[in-house]
Regions:
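Acidic-glycine-rich active-site phosphate/pyrophosphate-binding loop
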Residues: 1-15, 66-72
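ATP-dependent carboxylate/acyl-activation modules
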Residues: 3, 147-156
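Helical "substrate-binding/catalytic lid" subdomain
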Residues: 17-141
Length: 156
């Protein structure tokens, strides 16, 4: 049954280790999402459009499956390309913060990532997906990163 949802299954240890590893994995991917979002907003602000930005990153060393699905919202308006909600991202990053606190380590990048998602979560709507963070980060910085699809602006 697990094969239905998992690309691969790796046994990593004791009870609870899988959940902790999931939080670490999501921290890495959501950190990328926050970086992509801020980079896209800054790029647009200095005159580099999302398609021009993508033309440099795609097929280079920073290209990966996560980047490709993330960018499908901004470039194509594909709302369903990366179906993990901002609410779930914020929740996982809050759990990561608790895990770091319990372990007694500083978590400045995790907290910065969590705060990026906290703002998007608070602004709503509740059903927006992780790639829509770019639209939110753009908006709070006076940049319109709302994608168009079939000539129409998409909504988050």
């Amino acid at each position: 049954m697990l094969d239905t949802w998992a690309g691969r299954i790796v046994h990593i240890g004791d009870t609870g280790d899988g959940h902790r590893m999931k939080l670490l994995n999501n921290f890495i991917s959501l950190g990328y999402a926050a970086i992509y979002s801020e980079a896209l907003a800054l790029a647009e602000k200095v005159g580099i459009s999302p398609p021009r930005f993508d033309s440099v990153i795609r097929n280079g060393r920073m290209d990966c499956g996560f980047y490709q699905t993330f960018m499908r919202w901004t470039l194509e308006g594909d709302r369903d390309a990366h179906k993990f909600t901002i609410a779930n991202a914020f929740k996982d990053l809050t759990y990561l913060e608790s895990m770091a606190g319990a372990a007694g380590i500083a978590n400045p990048l995790g907290n910065a990532t969590k705060n990026a998602f906290a703002g998007a979560f608070a602004a709503g709507p509740a059903d927006q997906y992780v790639p829509m963070l770019a639209t939110h980060i753009g908006k709070v910085n006076g940049v319109d990163l709302t994608p168009t699809k079939d000539g129409k602006k998409q909504t988050t």
